[in-house]
A protein has these predicted regions:
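Exposed aromatic-hydrophobic patches
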Residues: 129-137
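N-terminal secretory signal peptides that target proteins for export/translocation
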Residues: 1-12
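Short beta-strand segments enriched for Tyr within beta-sheet-rich domains
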Residues: 92, 143-152
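Sec-dependent signal peptide recognition
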Residues: 13-19
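Beta-sheet-rich sandwich/jelly-roll-like modules and their strand-loop junctions
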Residues: 30-111, 154-213
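C-terminal motif of bacterial Sec signal peptides marking the signal peptidase cleavage site
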Residues: 25-28
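Solvent-exposed serine/threonine-rich low-complexity stretches and specific carbohydrate-binding patches
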Residues: 115-125
């Protein structure tokens, strides 16, 4: 009987010792955990700024249409612009006044006349800024001339005389003053999208771009 009691005492002591060890280990882990400092969160992605030349500005006046004869019914209208930093043209936009019916095609040209992008507008509103986001943004170089334009299939447009007689600058973008790099406020009578190469009264035809940088 004494052997059994001794065995039980020994077993109880071992069990108590085991529980004590588990308790002490738990306290130790809790102390270590309480001092744990999580790593800082990853930095947020860089903010990409985007800007347009004319912002929320809007022209006054009504839709115009030049009768040219000779079976030419369309017109292409554009603006020469530069960015002071490298960037990407995300969209080409134009201001539409009531009555500017027909199909419209956005285009972007390099200064040497190379076509960089051409897409047809869809889901236009009756008036206001019409924005076409390019299927693939076009990279542009700083301080380099580009031409943003749109083709109006029925020859409708809005213009502001002498609107580009002086440069128009917003943030990193500048619509060049007429004669800074050749003509500006450019147009061309045509029945299909084509690089505009004429100018009249330094007109602003309210063509614009959205550039990210």
């Amino acid at each position: 009987m004494e052997k059994i009691v001794g065995f039980l005492n020994t077993a109880m002591k071992k069990g108590a010792f085991t529980l004590l060890c588990i308790f002490l280990i738990g306290i130790s882990c809790k102390k270590e955990t309480s001092g744990y400092v999580p790593p800082p969160p990853p930095p947020p992605p860089p903010v990409i700024d985007s800007v347009s030349i004319f912002g929320t500005q809007a022209p006054t006046g009504k839709t115009e249409n030049d009768s040219t004869g000779g079976g030419i019914f369309g017109i292409e209208l554009g603006v020469k612009f530069r960015s002071s930093v490298n960037g990407k043209v995300e969209a080409v936009r134009f201001y539409k006044t009531p009555g500017n019916n027909g199909a419209h095609t956005a285009q972007l040209y390099a200064g040497d006349g190379t076509l960089l992008a051409s897409q047809v507008y869809g889901n236009e509103t009756d008036s206001g800024w019409q924005t076409l986001f390019l299927s693939a943004p076009i990279s542009i170089n700083a301080n380099t001339t580009y031409v943003a334009c749109y083709f109006s299939s029925l020859g409708n447009y809005i213009s502001t005389a002498n609107g580009l007689k002086t440069a128009v600058t917003n943030s990193v973008l500048t619509a060049l003053a007429d004669s800074t790099d050749g003509l500006n406020g450019v147009y061309k009578y045509t029945n299909q999208p084509s690089l505009p190469d004429s100018s009249h009264l330094s007109n602003n035809y309210w063509v614009d771009v959205i550039v990210s940088h």
